A protein has these predicted regions:
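A detector for short, charged/polar N-terminal pre-domain segments
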Residues: 1-5, 69-71
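DNA major-groove recognition helix of helix-turn-helix/homeodomain DNA-binding modules
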Residues: 45-60
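Conserved hydrophobic/aromatic packing and binding residues within compact polymer-binding modules
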Residues: 7, 21-22, 32-35, 61
Length: 77
């Protein structure tokens, strides 16, 4: 799944509008819509804010596979 699909799913699961999320991030609704359609990449500052808001990891929001995260941790050990 792509980041923009995950982002939209998280918002819809919580019955939030694009306008509500745009207001939360202090951006315009059009810019937020672009995040959800994949037209614009999400800046890191907004990625962090969204992860905290939704209670998910950046890996999850970015659509990275779980085994990739584990391999990365093992490589650092």
């Amino acid at each position: 799944m792509e980041t923009y699909e995950i982002l939209r799913g998280l918002r819809e699961d919580r019955d939030l509008t694009q306008q509500e999320m745009a207001d939360f991030l202090k951006i315009g609704r059009t810019m937020y819509r672009r995040y959800e359609t994949g037209e614009t990449e999400i800046p890191i500052r907004h990625l962090k804010t969204l992860c905290v808001f939704y209670g998910v990891s950046a890996d999850y929001l970015l659509g990275l596979p779980d085994n990739l995260s584990r391999r990365s941790k093992n490589a650092r050990a």
